[in-house]
Amino acid sequence: EYPQLGGDYEVIHHTQLLQHLVDEGKLVPVTPVEGIITYHDPCYLGRHNKIYTPPREIIGKVPGLRNEEMHRHKERGFCCGAGGARMWMEERIGKRINNERVDEALSLNPDIVSTACPFCLVMLTDSVNGKKNDGVAKESIQVVDVAQLLLDSVRTPLDPAGETETETAPEPEPVK
């Protein structure tokens, strides 16, 4: 409907923009993020829009990460459970979809489960937290968006005095 209102915009996913900025050298991952990572393909990004490469390329550029693919990935990916408003429903029988997906991720013993969708992030985090509470998942496992991984890697490491090596930006003036 935007063209009908005079807008002609190319819409891209944030992972496509971030991959472009990394490829152009405008964002340079330098700080290692150590560990095994597994990436969950969001339904709309992957199977609906056929975008599989940018998130994996970003992960591949972050030093220290070793990517392990889940059994069901890319075109054969499995939903996180948020689709169709199931995010707000309680299962009456069987296993919650997000728990099924997290069990698949945990079988790889990852340090990080990553995705590129805020709904997937909520569903995967909910399940991982439940697994931690039950003692099934290690306490150190994290669920993060690919953008957060990149941010953690482009930040300059702390110097021994505990300050970043880059100058800090001045605080903005409050709006009056």
Residue ranges and their predicted role:
Residues 1-176:
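Iron-sulfur cluster-binding electron-transfer modules in prokaryotic oxidoreductases
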